[in-house]
């Protein structure tokens, strides 16, 4: 999405202000369709190859759509559209599994890509440190103890077919809470990133991260982060309140004593304490749309003119909206995202982070068994009205 000059930004700001006061309705415009069922590639790619992040996509230079929706062993998907994808069982990224929490490279999920015209793709990496399974000696407590999470940065130079850390670990770190790993601390840390979205008002890049529980001075909730340089993992700044993105993220290992307060993010109001699966700029609503799943329930929507002030999240798509034939394969909802296949042609958005009045909601379902219905990625057409 092309950034705007000062005059056009001012006009856009007035239009956004007018649009933000209107009521918004979101309704399903048709039944969900399966985009990928993990049982279809079970015997080829393995039982652990499942949708374990929200669905992401970008358009490569050759016109092929690349889709990311996987686990710690990353297999790419490609096809002519976001609806017609073929899974490749070659691993383009394998989790590092480093047992040192200060390296920020243990169990890694490749997520949130952003493509450039020259073939470079950067992606956020959700990185879990699980002392119950990776650290020696093993932790004798169970989750939510012995667990923390951070966000790193990966890069590809070939439109996503191969990946590496953007900088040698731990210097690929994007975001961490300012506290060292502690086995007795309840699960916490910045993780579960949304997609990266461009704000047309300032041309900067943003994403949302989630902290599950209070840790030190850091409250639980959603932190919005911003940068002008996607290639520099240290350039991201968290929201500090009063419209300012001035919170830097540093490694807590070796951080001077007493500095934690300078690295605490102000969490968003009106959003639940659950991960934001996807964010999109709506060219119809002139607002940002966020989709959220909490504890396996339905998908909630929230709207914002500026990524700071959000409406109270409201569940607008749930089990009752599914046809009976789909309900039998779904025990819970998870991993929502917004991908509009018309975005590339309509507004030049090769990262599918813009949506129009009619745009699909992507989401994943948990089934009954990995060998029968398993996890699936679905796409449901949604209609927006104001």
Locations of regions flagged by a protein language model:
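N-terminal secretory signal peptides that target proteins for export/translocation
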Residues: 1-6
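Cleavable N-terminal signal peptides of Sec/SRP-targeted secreted and luminal proteins
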Residues: 8-23
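Beta-rich carbohydrate-recognition and catalytic domains
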Residues: 23-106, 114-183, 200-272, 282-328, ...
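Beta-rich catalytic cores
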Residues: 53, 107-109, 190-193, 273-275, ...
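Hydrophobic core register within WD40 beta-propeller blades
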Residues: 57, 113, 194-196, 277-279, ...
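Short, charged/polar low-complexity linear motifs in solvent-exposed/disordered segments
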Residues: 181-184, 331-337
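Substrate-binding groove/exosite segments of carbohydrate-active enzymes
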Residues: 187
